[in-house]
Amino acid sequence: PRPGIASCCTARSASKKNLALAAEASVSFVGVGDLVPNAPLYEDGFVTRAELKALQKAGAVGEMLGWVFDSQGELVSGMTNERVASAPLPSGGRALVVAAARGPNKVAAIHAAVARGLVNGLITDEDTAAQLLA
């Protein structure tokens, strides 16, 4: 299932069993999303255009599992992160967390996730890897 942003806080408790299983995982595979004008969070209806612009203004560069973070890999406080209904971000310090992401729009988000230790493995293409190493 796709991660989502709940319309209210009570919706977060709907899948406690699944969230508990996710917390116990020793390996996680995640995608890294960007926050460009046609970001999947917006296109898929999880955030409004106004929320996307507010996230961008707050310095957000990417998201994983719906959790929005800035260029330092820090979660953006408040805003849509208070409504995320997906599993918490896995800890790259205690489990293998592999991100799959590519493309120039995602370089800032991938860099932030790797630098902060949100992920400790990456599947990407050669062009994106070169941009990350530049």
What label would you give each PLM region?
Residues P1-A134:
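Conserved phosphate- and dinucleotide-binding cores of soluble alpha/beta proteins
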